[in-house]
Amino acid sequence: MSTLKTPFRYDFVGSFLRPEKLKAAKKAFEEGTITKEELDRVTDECVTEIVAKQKVAGFHAITDGEFRRKFWHLDFMWGFEGVAHEKDGGGVQFNGEMADLEATYLVGKVKAKAHPFVEYFKFLKQFEDEQTVAKYTIPAPAQMYQQMIVPQNIGQTRKFYVTDEELIEDIGKAYQDVIKQFYAAGCCNLQLDDCTWGAIVGDAAKQRYQSLGVDIEEVKARLLKVNNLALENRPEDMVITSHICRGNYHSTFFTSGPYDSVADYVFAQEHVDALLLEYDDERSGGFAPLAKVSPDKKVVLGLITTKKPELEDKDKVIARIHEAAKYIPLDRLCLSPQCGFASCEIGNKLTEEQQWAKLALVKEIAEEVWK
């Protein structure tokens, strides 16, 4: 069992572009020309291959590339009691493109059960060695809470939960159970992917909530509450990090805005060990909010974009790292791409070769900065 802990000086978020072999197998399965067992065999092969590539690239964290899921977040929610989904009706408008998502909603109280993702983790864990550790990525509890209170779901949710507080309580407890399942399977490095904070940054979000008569500070308090409730009673030697995202679908984004308005909550008060933060362009604002990060957290700067194939200027990235170090000590900083390469099956608009070139640049820069 590996004793390595994330994050590393050079790291990555988790998802990778799906190989053509896997895409073809999933299409064949959907068309009914291969069995589930045959699809699983191809998926196992592809996970084995992506882990090998991560090791060859010199990275210490290994993931399954999220190859076993269609969406970075929804598939995980389907693993709880009380949650149902259907193919149509879940589309979300991104910047210039409609994301084709599945409708995911409540049909009962949220409860934990034996979660299929734990079995996926067990397959990944076999590849750990002295130089690598398996990291598993799941959506943050706040993401599940947000999913169940969006306009198209709130009416259905109210059939089972009269108040948001009751919903938060059940989601938090269900996550506690699943976190313990991961730990029992040997997982000591878990990452919570969270678009909820990114969705409420900036003036546009504030104005949107004001128009609905909703106190945005109360929204922030609830997001913090459900995330921290889920982390109560976690194993002491389990590292849990959070990736704060503004949406990533086919190289488009969902929201824009600096971290200033949420830093007092997620940076200062969320009980995670590290924050993986998007900082690849001006949509993320400046580094000043990093001064709010509590001293027990590390920060992974997502300075290399996964949305575009062009490589960043190395010297400019190094300069930005040192700029960030004005607000948080350099020894608490790490480097990664700003997000995954394929948050959903469709993936971003770059090739596999360009994907690995991005990661090589991350490693090269980190080794120069933290000699």
Regions found by a protein language model. Name each.
Residues M1-K371:
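Domain-level signal for soluble alpha/beta catalytic cores
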